[in-house]
């Protein structure tokens, strides 16, 4: 599972969702979804803007957690 770490990053830096969306010139509802970890798809331009603005790497913004669901790869 991939989850967003945006909430902890901007909360720690005391940056609001509204300020971030305004500063990176991206729609507030989309940034809010990333903040709340509600996104099903991650737009590349948004990821690029957020990482550049916050001066972070993509792996700091998006966290991969192994799922407990077993997937059978035997074919």
From Swiss-Prot:
Keywords: Toxin-antitoxin system. Forms a complex with cognate toxin YopC. This is Putative antitoxin YopB. The keyword Lipoprotein does not apply. The keyword rRNA-binding does not apply. Pfam families: HTH_26. Disulfide bonds: none annotated. It comes from the Bacteria. GO terms for molecular function: DNA binding. May be the antitoxin component of a type II toxin-antitoxin (TA) system. Neutralizes the activity of cognate toxin YopC. Gene3D superfamilies: lambda repressor-like DNA-binding domains. It comes from Bacillus subtilis (strain 168).
